[in-house]
């Protein structure tokens, strides 16, 4: 069996310098190669200040790492683009770019599929196929920057997959994306969304890297949450909120609670008041997301009046809340609509 090659995009700059030592090369070559990677080098022969002997050696044991754009869809109603990327093993992942006036945000996937089973989300329908490696998450951002010529300023880990279910690779990706000689995206411009894997939430907090944490809550009641989110069978709302409080304490960052509003399921005045009571005193914000249509599901978004009544009820009880503007829904690129194949 052919030995699997080492993917250089999986390394930080310091790690690449260490890798040079393992192949009997000077560490400074690692910095040169790192620079070439982020200048867009596609092959080792593009690196014209690297000796031919080293390029040949690298060719034998390693590769740079590339995913390919299979398809790009552009929204007709807003500045959203959805990319379908083809991975080396033939799997497909989806990534969304949102071009705002003041920033460019990319929503990356971190798994092929998802095993969390949230029953309003398209990403989980085929289950989990595999985790993405750090470089495969990273290259979504690189390829979008190359395609558009625009610098990505903000990043959300809200595509297919649960980041904390792929924790080690997510953690390494966060180190790489922050590299000053790489893409240099600051931690305060990165948001990680989780459905609440409590032990990993504590581990994330202990990293003390101060990224923004978004918690998919969707109901103030354990019983109701278990019906729409199977992960709720493993962790109660109380356990999740305690982990959120710990995260706030360690990072001094506000936690965002994502709440998908589903008509007749979780959109009543009673639930708004229960949610406000639950979050009282926390450094937090509620992001209300009118459910986006997934053709295999019967869920519907509430009428606009109900949506804003829910928001007003939270704010009346001193819980900051906004209604998220849904972008990319006409290309199935909105929250909950990403999947591992194009339909």
From Swiss-Prot:
Amino acids binding [4Fe-4S] cluster: 114, 118, 121
GO terms for MF: 4 iron, 4 sulfur cluster binding; metal ion binding; rRNA (adenine(2503)-C2-)-methyltransferase activity; rRNA binding; tRNA (adenine(37)-C2)-methyltransferase activity; tRNA binding
Keyword Transferase: yes
EC number: 2.1.1.192
Catalytic residues as annotated in Swiss-Prot or TrEMBL: 94 (proton acceptor), 335 (s-methylcysteine intermediate)
Disulfide bonds: 107-335
GO cellular component term of the entry, any: cytoplasm
UniProt remark on cofactor binding: Binds 1 [4Fe-4S] cluster. The cluster is coordinated with 3 cysteines and an exchangeable S-adenosyl-L-methionine.
Function: Specifically methylates position 2 of adenine 2503 in 23S rRNA and position 2 of adenine 37 in tRNAs.
Residue positions binding S-adenosyl-L-methionine: 161-162, 193, 216-218, 292
Lineage top rank: taxon: Bacteria
Keyword Endoplasmic reticulum found: no
Cofactor(s) in the UniProt record: [4Fe-4S] cluster
Record's keyword terms, sorted: 4Fe-4S, Cytoplasm, Disulfide bond, Iron, Iron-sulfur, Metal-binding, Methyltransferase, rRNA processing, S-adenosyl-L-methionine, Transferase, tRNA processing
Family to which the UniProt record says this protein belongs: Belongs to the radical SAM superfamily. RlmN family.
Compartment list: Cytoplasm
HAMAP family xrefs: RNA_methyltr_RlmN
Protein known as: Probable dual-specificity RNA methyltransferase RlmN
Reactions the enzyme catalyzes: adenosine(2503) in 23S rRNA + 2 reduced [2Fe-2S]-[ferredoxin] + 2 S-adenosyl-L-methionine = 2-methyladenosine(2503) in 23S rRNA + 5'-deoxyadenosine + L-methionine + 2 oxidized [2Fe-2S]-[ferredoxin] + S-adenosyl-L-homocysteine; adenosine(37) in tRNA + 2 reduced [2Fe-2S]-[ferredoxin] + 2 S-adenosyl-L-methionine = 2-methyladenosine(37) in tRNA + 5'-deoxyadenosine + L-methionine + 2 oxidized [2Fe-2S]-[ferredoxin] + S-adenosyl-L-homocysteine
SUPFAM superfamilies: Radical SAM enzymes
Primary enzyme class: transferase
Example GO biological process: rRNA base methylation
Limits of the Radical SAM core domain: 100-330
Other observations noted: Reaction proceeds by a ping-pong mechanism involving intermediate methylation of a conserved cysteine residue.
Primary subcellular site in the record, as a coarse category: cytoplasm
């Amino acid at each position: 069996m052919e030995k699997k090659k080492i993917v250089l995009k999986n390394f930080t700059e310091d790690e690449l310098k260490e890798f040079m030592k393992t192949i009997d090369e000077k560490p400074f070559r690692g910095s040169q190669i790192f620079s070439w990677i982020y200048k867009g080098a596609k092959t080792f022969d593009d690196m014209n200040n690297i000796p031919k002997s080293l390029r040949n050696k690298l060719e034998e044991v390693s590769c740079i790492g590339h995913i390919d754009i299979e398809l790009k869809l552009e929204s007709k109603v807003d500045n959203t683009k959805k990319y379908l990327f083809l991975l080396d093993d033939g799997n497909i992942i989806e990534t969304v770019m949102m071009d705002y006036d003041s920033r460019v945000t990319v929503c990356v996937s971190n798994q092929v599929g998802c095993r969390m089973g949230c029953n309003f989300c398209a990403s989980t329908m085929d289950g989990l196929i595999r985790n993405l490696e750090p470089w495969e998450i990273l290259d979504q951002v690189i390829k979008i920057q190359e395609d558009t010529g625009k610098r990505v300023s903000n990043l959300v880990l809200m595509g297919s997959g649960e980041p904390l279910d792929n924790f080690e690779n997510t953690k390494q990706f966060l180190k790489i994306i922050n590299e000053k000689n790489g893409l240099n995206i600051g931690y305060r411009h990165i948001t990680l969304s989780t459905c609440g894997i409590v032990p990993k939430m504590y581990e994330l907090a202990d990293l003390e890297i101060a990224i923004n944490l978004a918690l998919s809550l969707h109901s103030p009641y354990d019983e109701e949450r278990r019906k729409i989110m199977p992960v709720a069978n493993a962790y109660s709302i109380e356990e999740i909120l305690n982990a959120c409080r710990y995260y706030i304490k360690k990072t001094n960052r506000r936690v965002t609670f994502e709440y998908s509003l589903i008509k007749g399921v979780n959109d009543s005045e009673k639930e708004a008041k229960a949610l406000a009571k639950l979050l009282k005193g926390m450094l937090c914000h509620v992001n209300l997301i009118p459910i986006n249509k997934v053709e295999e599901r019967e869920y519907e978004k509430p009428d606009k009046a109900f949506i804003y009544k829910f928001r007003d009820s939270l704010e009346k009880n001193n819980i900051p809340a906004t209604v998220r503007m849904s972008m990319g829904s006409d290309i199935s690129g909105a929250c909950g609509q990403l999947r591992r194949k194009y339909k």
